[in-house]
Amino acid sequence: MPKYRSATTTHGRNMAGARALWRATGMTDDDFGKPIIAVVNSFTQFVPGHVHLRDLGKLVAEEIEASGGVAKEFNTIAVDDGIAMGHGGMLYSLPSRELIADSVEYMVNAHCADAMVCISNCDKITPGMLMASLRLNIPVIFVSGGPMEAGKTKLSDKIIKLDLVDAMIQGANPNVSDADSDQIERSACPTCGSCSGMFTANSMNCLTEALGLSQPGNGSLLATHADRRELFLNAGRRIVALTKRYYEQDDESALPRNIASKAAFENAMTLDIAMGGSTNTVLHLLAAAQEGEIDFDISDIDRLSRLVPHLCKVAPSTPKYHMEDVHRAGGVLGILGELDRAGLMDNSVRNILGLSLRETLDRYDIMLTQDDAVKKMFRAGPAGIRTTQAFSQDTRWETLDDDRQHGCIRAREFAFSQDGGLAVLYGNLAENGCIVKTAGVDEGSLVFSGPAKVYESQDDAVAAILGGKVVAGDVVVIRYEGPKGGPGMQEMLYPTTYLKSMGLGKACALITDGRFSGGTSGLSIGHASPEAASGGTIALVKDGDIINIDIPQRGIQLDVAENELAARRLEEDARGEAAYTPHGRERQVSFALRAYATLATSADKGAVRDKSKLGG
């Protein structure tokens, strides 16, 4: 029988000092026999997806204590990728994932907590907490802040839905008036919550459901809706039961590595492909799998991407649907239900509810359930009122979207495409693979060839695009923006956004060893591995080289003879210590970022730290 970790600090005469300090936090004699459960919050006023979380940790803590546990809350950092976008702040986004994972480990291990509730939401916070959970392998439940309502405004006598990306595109479009741009900006992000499309934050919060670590509705139920309160209350109650299952009943099925097994990771990736999720999820799932010592790598993603159809199309891939529409159509379990009926799920995996996926679908898939309370929950909708308050409205859709032929979520035979929403491409330009969000690629661009326009930084590429130096047919190559070369693997949302603003969104391709925002669409290929700073072929590309992209055949090829590439590599090697560094780029890189770069691996490994360099 495992011993409560917290007993290390609460039992024995030699722990009198620790108990004295615990008493100073409000603990009593009765508390010293109870499990100590960390409430890992991420409240900050910097991020709309986290601005409403201040009191939600207390809500969870009160339920933990009412259920027989001791709750202790702490906070992690949280970077807003949208605000950090397009300047030096974006260098810090991906490295913050590692800091979050480490800070959770530090706090939980330093104080010997027995279990955790992770209150996450936005881009790097959920992945960082997920990595920590699998690293620590103690009972955990995720409950995120929830999605933002979609923006809505009236332009040209038509009501349109909006999100952050629309504000960025129209703000840079010279053909849009100042008045219209301002109206779109003011309407795009109306409430608290993670940005309203299938961007990175919402993708990851959906994936925690598929991994079995969060409750039904976690990924899609709006931040503003009163129903979301119940997820937080249930998390507080359920984590105590989960904790006691492990420590008092020796039930290892309560541990995250046994819930988020390889089969669960494959289910999660299958979901991601089916819903056309953010390409960043590839990085984060690979990183989390390594933390949990789970045998899941990019070859698994490639295999799944060839099998799974595209069943759910959401902004930024279409303006028609946002997360509120996904929820109305049954949320994550609506998609998983269609995948299960298509024979693409392992429905034996179990979750924090103690149910198998098969049992969970029977109760929570709107196409199967007879539970009126479940149907009511999935009718939770937007109120259209600007607010930063959680649980501030209780609007309901009159009906569910159960149209699996024409609706937001489709059955396999009516899929948006039989090819999934993400693909791994291989070739001499990316020998270890690169990622494209096929859900956002125009059908006419699935096969594309063009001359390279090479830039050593995102900033140079943006200047060239806005300056008219990039023309239809070009393949924009942005290199030395990988985990090591950036450092920090910046998101390239501004270059892709500005291509659209200049009318080139369907006429150009973009390839980078950096990454893309979940808000990116178009022929945008990221995560080229090995990255330029690690000697990848992308470092050898020259202006005018022809690059051939074939998504159906999963190929990406630099049309340069092998002997010419060998000569270029010798020339690059001859630069000595400057080899595989950007030519003429001036960028201030802090000590913290240099330290990150020293251990960073390429994207095909999840951009995690290279443990071999530490002897581990």
From Swiss-Prot:
Enzyme Commission numbers on file: 4.2.1.9
Binding residue positions for Mg(2+): D81, D123, K124, E491
Q: Which cysteines are joined by disulfide bonds?
A: none
Listed binding positions for [2Fe-2S] cluster are C122, C195
Question: How is the cofactor bound here?
Answer: Binds 1 [2Fe-2S] cluster per subunit. This cluster acts as a Lewis acid cofactor.
Q: In which pathway does it act?
A: Amino-acid biosynthesis; L-isoleucine biosynthesis; L-isoleucine from 2-oxobutanoate: step 3/4; Amino-acid biosynthesis; L-valine biosynthesis; L-valine from pyruvate: step 3/4
Q: List cofactor names only.
A: [2Fe-2S] cluster; Mg(2+)
Q: Name one GO biological process term.
A: L-valine biosynthetic process
Q: Known PROSITE patterns for this protein? A: ILVD_EDD_1 (PS00886), ILVD_EDD_2 (PS00887)
Subunit comment for this entry?
A: Homodimer.
Which PANTHER family does the record match to this protein?
Answer: D-XYLONATE DEHYDRATASE, D-XYLONATE DEHYDRATASE YAGF-RELATED
Name this protein carries in UniProt: Dihydroxy-acid dehydratase
